[in-house]
Amino acid sequence: LNSTSKFALPEVYTFLEMYDAGRIEQLNILQRWMTNDSTKSLQAPIGIDTNGMPIVLDIHEKAHGPHGLIAGSTGSGKSEFIITYILSLAVNYHPNDVSMILIDYKGGGLAGAFQKGDVKLPHIVGTITNIDKAGLQRSLVSIQSELRRRQVKFNQAREKTDEGTIDIYKYQKLYHDGIVKEPIPHLLIICDEFAELKQQQPDFMDELISVARIGRSLGV
């Protein structure tokens, strides 16, 4: 191949192939959890480009940023992308560093991808579906309560260390250094079928946007 040749994207490229692994054990998940530092980067591979090189998404504040929107026509693979991204984050970061709430407006199919019997992905701390309408309001109360809890913990850490301000990155570094004892992970709120949620639950969406705005420095 000469230098101008392009890599031919395969029709099917598995998650393990993206990590150059043949078996799950070869992902070396525990080693990744120990070595990857969520205070410096939150990068996770999500695919390959036309040169065969990894495409990486990094939602760290100093990289791509914490908010994002996936757009595509019906059947274009938006849900598959979300599954890939969630798994990639889980492979690279300990549940003490990254956790997730799933808002699944496809009837629970997304959440089901991360659970087999009684075994589920430890990073997923909550699931909201369009089947459980009453659960929407309960979940919002829980998220707002978590924001207040984080504010209290960050203030306690600030007083303990005499820091001027504490954000999620500083707090996690204090935890990794053993200065504070309770882990507080980044909490990602991931919504599948965002447009459907916005149309059916506009008040919930307004509150969710407010949570995202207020919660940025708190890791939400």
Segments from the language model and where they lie:
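Intrinsic disorder/low-complexity signal
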Residues: 10, 16-19, 161-162, 166
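P-loop NTPase catalytic phosphate-binding loop
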Residues: 1, 16-17, 24-160, 178-220
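Short glycine-rich substrate-engagement loop in P-loop NTPases that contacts/grips substrate
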Residues: 154-172
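N-terminal accessory nucleic-acid engagement/regulatory domains that precede
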Residues: 1-11
